Amino acid sequence: MQLNDVHRGITKHRPRKRIGRGPGSGTGKTSGRGHKGHKSRSGYSRKPNFQGGAMPMFRRVPKRGFNNRWALTIFAVNVGKLNDAFNEGETVTLEALAAKNLAKGNFDELKVLGDGELTKKLTIQAHRFSKSAEEKISAAGGTAEKLAPKRTPDERVEALKSEK
């Protein structure tokens, strides 16, 4: 083999495949589509959920429930986690929780629950508090500031309608 033989047979642009040009071409008669069947016909397109004529999976599986478009997404956090994550005298908000990677995602409201021990004096701003959480916060010398809801249910419905 010589250096000038290296690129022999390799072309930059491969010639297009000429189908249906007789048996000698290798793609004559059926033009590479095989014999009969839906895929051999012109205008064929397979639906993404077509399963060969069998009952499709989405029809076999039972359906349950629904997704409530107007439901609030509430992030719940226990006072024990707040005790571990925050220092004495700090203010706890949904933004502060997100900054400390405790609340990941978008939430409408923050709810504080009473599991765990709270020994630090914290100012907690949340939309909802459980009774035990309020008791533990006040026992530790902190304050529980109740925030007004971000949006009323009617405002949420209007916002969703305006998105369309």
Swiss-Prot record:
GO biological process terms held by the UniProt record: translation
Molecular function GO terms recorded: rRNA binding; structural constituent of ribosome
Bias type Basic and acidic residues, positions: 147-164
NCBIfam families per UniProt: rplO_bact
Annotated keywords: Ribonucleoprotein, Ribosomal protein, RNA-binding, rRNA-binding
Self-association state and partner proteins as the record states: Part of the 50S ribosomal subunit.
Region feature (Disordered): 1-57, 132-164
Organism: Rhodopirellula baltica (strain DSM 10527 / NCIMB 13988 / SH1)
Family: Belongs to the universal ribosomal protein uL15 family.
Segments of skewed composition (Basic residues): 9-20, 32-41
A family per Pfam: Ribosomal_L27A
Superkingdom of origin organism: Bacteria
Gene: rplO
PROSITE patterns documented for this protein: RIBOSOMAL_L15
GO cellular component: cytosolic large ribosomal subunit
SUPFAM superfamilies: Ribosomal proteins L15p and L18e
Name of the protein described by the UniProt record: Large ribosomal subunit protein uL15
Biased composition (Gly residues): 21-31
Role: Binds to the 23S rRNA.
InterPro entries: Ribosomal_uL15 (IPR030878), Ribosomal_uL15/eL18 (IPR021131), Ribosomal_uL15/eL18_sf (IPR036227), Ribosomal_uL15_bac-type (IPR005749), Ribosomal_uL15_CS (IPR001196)
